[in-house]
Amino acid sequence: MTKVLLGFMGVGKTTVSKHLSMHCKDMDAIIEAKIGMSIAAFFEQHGEIAFRTIESQVLKDLLFTNDNSVIVTGGGVVVLQENRQLLRKNHQHNILLVASFETLYQRLKHDKKSQRPLFLKYSKEAFYEFYQQRMVFYEGLSDLVIRVDHRTPEEVANIIEGY
């Protein structure tokens, strides 16, 4: 069964996936190859709704492949009801990586490379509300929750591989 890594933007899903011995499919990389530009540029040119539509199709395609790989999702994959339904069908194989809000905020604030559109859009207070809303979805879909604040990516990868 395919395992799915879930978590808020900046939690380390992509970083952890690089330490897994299992085959990983990074949705953001797949989407960027499909659209021919960065996600940030696509957001700016076409908007979030257009992006979520593509993201949903990619998730569906990857889940139906069912090849014992790990799908590394983007932080907003839980936004659409359709995606949450797809993830519920993957019951017992959804893994949530969790970090404290302050850890995430500092990572995103200092990440000059990614410049995530939804992070740049909000004040810290509004971003916290956004974080809390998303966490409700993640927690409702997750079968294993791994706190990453005081763990190395290698330690998190070992937990995932043992699950």
UniProtKB/Swiss-Prot annotation:
Disulfide bonds: none
Note on cofactor: Binds 1 Mg(2+) ion per subunit.
Pathway(s) per entry: Metabolic intermediate biosynthesis; chorismate biosynthesis; chorismate from D-erythrose 4-phosphate and phosphoenolpyruvate: step 5/7
GO molecular function, one term: shikimate kinase activity
Entry-linked InterPro entries: P-loop_NTPase, Shikimate/glucono_kinase, Shikimate_kinase/TSH1
Enzyme Commission number, as recorded: 2.7.1.71
Name the UniProt record assigns to this protein: Shikimate kinase
Name of the gene: aroK
